[in-house]
């Protein structure tokens, strides 16, 4: 959603990928933006995480679903950009992935193995006249380490109003089977304090969803949505399954 003095600066998604699974992360820019996309597995060991995706790959697609870039092992020439955008350093020679690409409109990054494990996907605004306006991620999620964690940063001097959704059951209408029947959405601030949560949605949000280009949710469904006004700073959204359930879920911002 729009704001005069604030904007989305970056997005990060952490989840667990099973064998032969992929994580889809979409983002939209209004105008041309240079974006840095990273898929990190081995480097997460430095933060105490285990069961990591050993060799993540990134494939980047445009709005016409044409592949426009891909990467397996990151190029050390990008290391200075990591510092510029505030990203943590990667170990030289690691099998993490990263690519730099000018994007305009809707782009989709698909992250896959080989193998299985936890992966962190990051999308950074590096520069350009446009702005990052929305983001989404879809994956099979459950509880605990199998929850989907999405980090976002609101940049600027004013608060920004965001519509945040976790969609499970509605995905069946788009040919996606096994949608998470009852997703729960929790939002945390920079101090890890929970500031909002929901496991349903209010039908009064339906017109608002249409105004920002989001598809309608089915009245009475157990999909979840929150409308929040957030001050500048970092936030984390967590999506998990109620009652230790698992299934495909779409996170939208």
Please tell me what each predicted stretch does.
Residues 1-253:
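A sequence-level detector for low-complexity, Ser/Thr- and acidic-rich stretches
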């Amino acid at each position: 959603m729009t704001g005069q003095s604030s904007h989305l600066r970056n997005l990060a998604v952490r989840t667990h990928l099973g064998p032969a699974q992929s994580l889809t992360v979409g983002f939209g820019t209004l105008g041309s933006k240079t974006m840095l996309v990273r898929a990190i597995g081995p480097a997460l060991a430095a933060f105490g995480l285990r069961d990591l995706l050993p060799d993540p790959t990134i494939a980047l697609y445009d709005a016409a679903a044409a592949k426009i870039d891909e990467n397996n092992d990151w190029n050390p020439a990008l290391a200075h950009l990591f510092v510029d955008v505030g990203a943590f350093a990667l170990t030289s020679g690691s099998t993490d992935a990263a690519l730099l690409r000018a994007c305009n409109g809707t782009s989709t990054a698909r992250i896959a193995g080989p193998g299985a494990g936890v992966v962190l996907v990051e999308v950074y605004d590096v520069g350009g006249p446009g702005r990052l306006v929305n983001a989404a991620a879809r994956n099979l999620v459950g509880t605990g380490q199998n929850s989907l964690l999405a980090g976002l940063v609101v940049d600027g001097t004013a608060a920004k109003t965001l519509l945040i959704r976790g969609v499970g059951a509605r995905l069946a209408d788009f040919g996606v089977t096994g949608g998470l029947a009852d997703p729960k959405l929790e939002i945390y601030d920079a101090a890890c304090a929970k500031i909002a949560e929901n496991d349903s949605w209010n039908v009064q949000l339906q017109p608002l969803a249409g105004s920002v280009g989001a598809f309608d949710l089915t009245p009475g469904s157990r999909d979840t949505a929150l409308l929040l006004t957030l001050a500048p700073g970092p936030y984390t959204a967590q999506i998990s399954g109620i009652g230790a359930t698992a299934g495909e879920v779409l996170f939208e911002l």
